[in-house]
Structures are given as C-alpha cells and as structure tokens.
Amino acid sequence: MAKLFSRAATFDHIQAFLEDTHGQITIGEIPPIRRAALAAQGKNPRVSLVGRPNETVPELLQRLDVALAAFIASGTITDEVLPEIKRRRAAPQK
C-alpha cells in the first residue's frame, strides 16, 4: 500500500472553488487517459489536468490547487486533457 501523507496537505484553492462555485472535482480515468483531475462548474470545465508518469494523487491534487488559484484570480482555464486526447488520436496506431 502507498505511504500515507506524512504531513497535512492543504488545498485552499480547491476548498474555495467548491465553496464559491458549488462546482465539482473529479479524479479518475478519461479514456484513453489513465488518470486525470477535473474541476468544473456544471458542464463547464475550468481545470483539466493529465496525471504525469509516476505522479502521486497528492501531487496531482497540488497541481490542481495551483491551477485553480489561477482560475480564481484571473479566470484562467487550464486544459491538458483535450490536447492530450487529440495528440493520441493523431498518433500512428501500433
């Protein structure tokens, strides 16, 4: 089993996003992407991240928190998922 957090992590921007927007956070598979993290308001994605090789869930959540800070501060939308799906579809099949 993976090692538990040795220190408490805070995700202030995730907390603020959930409280202020009544949005949702999802972590999971979006085929063909094995691991992704999404923050959305209704059907409107605000942040979508692709899990990196060997990235832990806490590390992915930390990146989500940072990206949500940018969204909260300036409305910056981050989308790693759609470009990655397009890239994989365009790649030659083995």
Segments predicted by a language model, with ranges:
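Short, well-ordered helical secondary-structure segments
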Residues: 5-8, 12-14, 42-44, 48-51, ...
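Short, charged, intrinsically disordered terminal tails
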Residues: 7, 74-94
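Compositionally biased, intrinsically disordered low-complexity segments
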Residues: 28-30, 50-52, 80, 88
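Amphipathic alpha-helical packing elements
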Residues: 35-79
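Short, flexible helical or helix-coil boundary motifs
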Residues: 21, 25, 68-71, 75, ...
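N-terminal acidic leader/helix
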Residues: 4-35
